[in-house]
Curated annotation (Swiss-Prot):
Gene3D superfamilies: Glycogen Phosphorylase B. It comes from Glycine max. Belongs to the UDP-glycosyltransferase family. This is Soyasapogenol B glucuronide galactosyltransferase. UDP binds at residues 291, 349-350, 367, 371-372, 375. Pfam families: UDPGT. The gene is GmSGT2. Coiled coil: none annotated.
Length: 495
């Protein structure tokens, strides 16, 4: 495709995981909304997560498309369709997905060359792409799927190693050098921060690639974590732009929200929507633990009992555990809740944006994945925090200690995303958090009020003159200047 004069042309390359794909695709759609030509490169199975959204945008005349590449499943010994790090991916297959991804690197680099973009935006887990961009003489911008606080906290642990001073795994220590006095325990830290492993080396490579990049993009906004936005730019010494909340900005009507992710059949949507619409305002608890988490049977029992005993209506998003007592238990529980009309179970993917904005929802129990935290802020909802893996425990600190819009369930132990872990949070702890979250007494000192105020700030950030809107316009302006400067050099006569 020929580039028009003055038109910016870009490539967006997500990682092979739904929680990374969705926000980066929303960012790509925002660039197209601002008249930047966008090509998203991914594999066939992963494209199904967002293709409906791209088709919608293209039908509106926006310059955006998907370029699908074949995942080398046969070469790495994987069944067709297993090409992402998701809840249904068997643990033993994850190393082969990494192998397949490494084989795709040459394919991606060739596309960078052939499509002739003016810049690329790639996920943090593509650190090699900064050198690929340098070869082409174009900027690479890194996408971070986490919060500014989480990245700042990880840097604090790497630089100061405060966990090594703790005598026991459960002893609390302060994370040095941060804008707030945040306490953690060793058990709450990701394993790669506790002691060096292969992932530690990968994260070092990612940090080095970020410092060589033109800058980084975050799904955040200034009023949400302003101190950490400034702190992170200071410690990294690089440019960074918060252009969130991207889900709010890129999905401003019901059609967009319904198309996002693994869209359900219409009759399935009507089921939960009809149930929700029959409930009183702010009376329903939403319970979801993200797109890649599974719980053991023992934990499912504790959650179910806590929800049933709470007396509150609830929607619970549950995952198939490949048969066994966990699935059987949930099916029986679902029948009982249908009979009492107290609970509604959604199996698999849930249209979270549509659910959270429903006036019946009064709060949510969340794993503190960053996408969900931001979407909860958009909706003005307080949270009961249940961190599990990745940077979740850092995000909990932002929600509970900094923003004061959440109450902790009491999870104490970090685990890998594809493991159950040894911790089982008891129904009493879950019940206490739910009671505090859904209380109408405001004993928390205004948690619900603060959540509503942040929702207003989120909406202001993406309006003309808002912090995220200004960041987007400034970044595009800089990228246009780089393009024009490059073109001037290429057309200048030789001395």
């Amino acid at each position: 495709m020929e580039k028009k004069k003055g038109e910016l042309k870009s490539i967006f390359l997500p990682f092979l995981s739904t929680s990374h794909i969705i926000p980066l695709v929303d960012m790509a759609r925002l660039f197209a909304l601002h008249d930047v030509d966008v090509t998203i490169i991914t594999t066939a199975h992963n494209a199904t997560v967002f293709q409906k959204s791209i088709d919608l945008d293209a039908s509106r005349g926006r310059p955006i498309r998907t370029h699908v590449v074949n995942f080398p499943a046969a070469q790495v010994g994987l069944p067709v369709g297993i090409e992402a790090f998701n809840v249904d991916t068997p643990r033993e297959m994850t190393p082969r997905i990494y192998m397949g991804l490494s084989l795709l690197q040459q394919v991606f680099e060739k596309l960078f060359h052939d499509l002739q973009p003016d810049f690329i935006v790639t996920d943090m887990f593509h650190p090699w792409s900064v050198d690929a961009a340098a070869k082409l003489g174009i900027p690479r911008i890194m996408f971070h799927g986490a919060s500014y606080l989480a990245r700042s906290a990880a840097h604090s642990v790497e630089q100061y190693a405060p966990h090594l001073e703790a005598k026991f795994d459960t002893d609390k220590f302060v994370l040095p050098g941060l804008p707030d006095n945040l306490e953690m325990t060793r058990l709450q830290l990701p394993d790669w921060l506790r002691s060096p492993n292969q992932y530690t080396e990968l994260m070092r490579t990612i940090k080095q690639s970020e410092k060589k990049s033109y800058g980084s993009l975050f799904n955040s906004f200034y009023d949400l974590e302003s101190a950490y936005y400034e702190h992170y730019k200071s410690i990294m010494g690089t440019k960074s732009w918060g252009i969130g909340p991207v889900s709010l900005w890129a999905n401003q009507d019901a059609q967009d929200k319904a198309a996002r992710g693994y869209a359900k059949e219409e009759e399935e949507k009507e089921g939960w929507l009809k149930w929700l619409n029959s409930k009183a305002e702010s009376s329903v608890l939403y319970v979801s633990f993200g797109s890649i988490n599974k719980f053991p049977y023992s934990q499912l029992v504790e959650i179910a009992r806590a929800l049933e005993d709470s007396g509150h209506d609830f929607i619970w998003v549950v995952r198939k555990n490949d048969g066994g007592e966990g699935d059987n238990f949930l099916e029986e529980f679902e029948k009982r809740m249908k009979e009492s009309n107290k609970g509604y179970l959604i199996w698999g993917w849930a249209p979270q944006l549509l659910i959270l904005e429903n006036p019946a929802i009064g709060g949510l129990v969340t794993h503190c994945g960053w996408n969900t935290v931001v979407e909860s802020v958009n909706a003005g909802l307080p949270m009961a925090t249940w961190p599990l893996f990745a940077e979740h425990f850092f995000n909990e600190k932002l929600v509970v200690d900094v923003l004061k819009i959440g109450v902790p369930v009491g999870a104490k132990e970090w685990r890998n995303w594809n493991e159950f872990g040894s911790e089982v949070v008891k129904r009493e702890e879950i019940g206490n958090a739910i009671a505090s979250l859904m209380s109408e007494e405001e004993e928390d000192g205004g948690m619900r009020k603060r959540a509503k105020e942040l929702s207003v700030a989120a909406k202001s950030a993406i309006k003309v003159g808002g912090s995220s809107h200004n960041n987007m316009k400034e970044l595009i302006r800089e990228l246009k200047e780089i393009k024009l400067s490059k073109e001037a050099q290429e057309t200048a006569p030789n001395p």
